[in-house]
Amino acid sequence: MSTNATGPLAGVRVVELAGLGPAPFAAMLLADLGAQVVRVDRPAGAGAARQDVVNRGKRSVAADLKAPGGRDLVLELVERADVLLEGFRPGVAERLGLGPAACSERNRRLVYGRMTGWGQQGPLAKVAGHDIDYIALSGALWASGRAEERPVPALNLVGDYAGGSMFLVMGVLAALLEVGRSGEGQVVDAAMVDGASVLTTMFTALQGMGVWGADRGTNVFDTGAPFYEVYACADGRWVAVGALEPQFYAELVRVSGFLEGAPDEVRYAQPAPADWPAHKAIWERLWRTRSRDEWTALLGHTDACVQPVLDWAERLEHPHLLERGTFVEVDGIVQPAPAPRLSRTPGAICRRPPVPGEHTREVAAEAGLDAAAIDALIASGAVMQA
């Protein structure tokens, strides 16, 4: 592990009010890039912290936000912070005395990042929900799946992480840049339903251009096209095919032996949408003539755009990912390495995930509290040292 003192965000101080999912992941991304992240956990928080790699690179303070002493400690941290991240329902942080107004009163340069599903305003703002609900309203869920079958979510990647965490990080970094010009912080209202909707921008454009149909599973990217599909092989495992461009499709046809013996003008021409079902049936039969690994050996290093569908364990052993170090082992835990990769100030995993409250004394002292004051807070139950 590295201290990552030279990461691109070295010196940026982040306070994360502990929650689940997107906000902690956003804080992890900032920590990977060198930010000094202090996670404020609940005093009763426990569990398998060592395995929760979303908390890597962070220090942990355990504080009861409903107790005046716990809240006041967080406000002391806010005075010295550049960023605060929270993922509560709208109004909760305000009721705790830790909303944007209270925090900006202590630090006018603070970037206040808010992660919610529905956003801070709107009829659903205070309604419970999860990734699947947010992508349902965005239209992203409707488009995911096969023809005449139910929509299928891609885990909780689209709403929580792509539409949530990534947009929160982007907003925070943009606001930090703006602070350098204005000297004033601001609130970043990152709603997963907004982010997921932005992710559908290209498909919105394609619909407007008349080249994307309303029916699921009938278009190029939604498994309608035979050259952009997942196919079962002879051993029951799968290959992913993405031969979109004509030259890549021609390579796929040539190397795989598809329609061998047919005239070139028939064999190498990408089929029109009306012919997709018939061509897909032929491809399905062909893919079942070899195992996944046999197809990978034949096509994986060509421009046919074919790769094996790997499970969680297999991905760790793929030669390309091994050479790039896409997964690393830190403190005995295998996990994805920081991304993206910067040439001069790369990201790094600077510390293992903390036990809740592991750094309470250390962080409180850095905030200016003396030993007696820290002891009093611990004795009152407002904070906890693990």
Q: In which residue ranges do the predicted regions lie?
A:
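Flexible, small-/acidic-enriched active-site or ligand-binding loops
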Residues: 2, 332-376
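Conserved small-residue-rich beta-alpha loop and adjacent elements
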Residues: 6-45
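A short, aliphatic-rich alpha-helical micro-motif
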Residues: 9, 75-79, 127
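A structured beta-alpha segment of the ubiquitous adenosine-cofactor-binding alpha/beta core
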Residues: 15, 54-106
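Active-site-adjacent "lid/gating" segments in soluble enzymes
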Residues: 29, 33, 94-244
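Glycine-rich phosphate-binding loop and adjoining beta1-alpha1-beta2 segment
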Residues: 32-64
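Aromatic-enriched alpha-helical interface/lid elements that frame and gate functional surfaces
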Residues: 227-302, 306
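A glycine-rich dinucleotide-binding beta-alpha-beta segment and adjacent secondary-structure elements
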Residues: 300-350
